[in-house]
């Protein structure tokens, strides 16, 4: 079992994600917020045009189901899983996150695009790691109402789980945890 959580001292806001495997693989996350952003279960069909801001649309795209807030027709996913069984969750990481400005000659992915960008084109954690190593997680807000959220991420399939953090010292750090 792999569990990722973060709690601010004295704060009520905390999220926990977990992935464990017996004969099946289970992936999930809670959302410990005192208020709602209007989140709902959202299904993004195959080949949905996300309109990524700085990257081209992938040539193939998997269907995604998860919890999201819909703004201007765009699913702002909190956590989700694709049709291949790859799951991804964003968890609070306030005070630790650093998103870069757009970097020339890198694949620039906005923080709000990160979950669908990975899930629409990857089947496994290994494929996700390959894409993450080539990308820049950038600081472009979704809108004036939705600035970049201070999140770190858990990505999991039936064999492997990683944590992804965008921090100033090393840009993007990936922590691997082999499931038992």
Predicted regions and their residues:
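Weak global preference for isoleucine
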Residues: 13, 41, 64-65, 70, ...
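Short, Lys/Arg-enriched N-terminal segments with co-localized hydrophobic residues
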Residues: 1-13
């Amino acid at each position: 079992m792999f569990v990722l959580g973060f709690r601010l001292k004295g704060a009520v806001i905390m999220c926990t994600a977990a992935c464990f495997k017996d004969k099946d693989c289970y992936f999930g996350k809670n959302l410990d917020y005192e208020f709602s952003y209007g989140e709902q279960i959202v299904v993004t069909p195959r080949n949905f045009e996300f309109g990524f801001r700085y990257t081209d649309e992938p040539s193939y795209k998997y269907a995604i189901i998860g919890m999201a807030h819909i703004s201007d027709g765009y699913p702002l996913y909190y956590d989700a899983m694709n049709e291949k069984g790859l799951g991804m969750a964003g968890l609070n990481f306030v005070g630790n996150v650093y998103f870069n400005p757009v970097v020339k000659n890198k694949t620039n992915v906005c923080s709000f695009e990160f979950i669908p960008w990975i899930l629409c084109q990857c089947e496994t954690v290994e494929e996700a790691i390959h894409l993450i190593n080539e990308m820049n997680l950038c600081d472009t807000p979704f809108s004036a109402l939705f600035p970049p959220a201070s999140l770190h991420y858990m990505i999991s399939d039936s064999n492997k789980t990683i944590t992804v953090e965008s921090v100033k010292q090393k840009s993007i750090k990936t922590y691997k945890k082999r499931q038992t």
